[in-house]
């Protein structure tokens, strides 16, 4: 497991290319900050994050993308709140908790992949 956040992760991508055998594939799951409720929260947490720039970064390097829709579903509100507090800084987490009713959150991700 590794984190690749677009520009700046080139050394990690080189290492990934090195260890993937011929005929293999590499996969990266990335938040799709251009859509979904979670994507909006992500943009609030990281205002300098430009989804278009990140998509161009991966595409220029030959990665293919599948856009996936997933979600969070909780049985208890306390569990939702605990996860939000893990994912976001305290002030934003409290804003999200106050603004979002319910036990479900739509969450979009990009599945980036490249065959070797």
Predicted feature residues:
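A short SAM/SAH-binding and catalytic strip from SAM-dependent methyltransferases
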Residues: 1-10
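A short glycine-rich, Lys/Arg-flanked "PGG" loop and its adjoining helix->strand segment in the class I
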Residues: 10-22
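Conserved Class I S-adenosyl-L-methionine
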Residues: 57-59, 64-116
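Short loop segments at secondary-structure junctions
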Residues: 22-23, 116
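Conserved class I S-adenosyl-L-methionine
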Residues: 25-56
């Amino acid at each position: 497991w590794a984190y690749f956040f677009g520009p700046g992760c080139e050394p990690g991508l080189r290492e990934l290319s090195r260890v993937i055998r011929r005929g293999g594939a590499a996969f990266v799951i990335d938040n799709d900050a251009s859509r979904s409720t979670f994507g909006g929260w992500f943009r609030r947490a990281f205002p300098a994050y430009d989804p278009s720039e990140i998509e161009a970064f991966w595409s220029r390097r030959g990665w293919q993308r599948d856009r996936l829709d997933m979600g969070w579903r909780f049985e208890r509100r306390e569990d939702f709140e605990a996860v939000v507090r893990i994912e976001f800084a305290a002030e934003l987490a409290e804003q999200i908790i106050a603004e979002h009713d319910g036990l479900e959150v739509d969450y979009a991700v990009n599945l980036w992949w490249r065959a070797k």
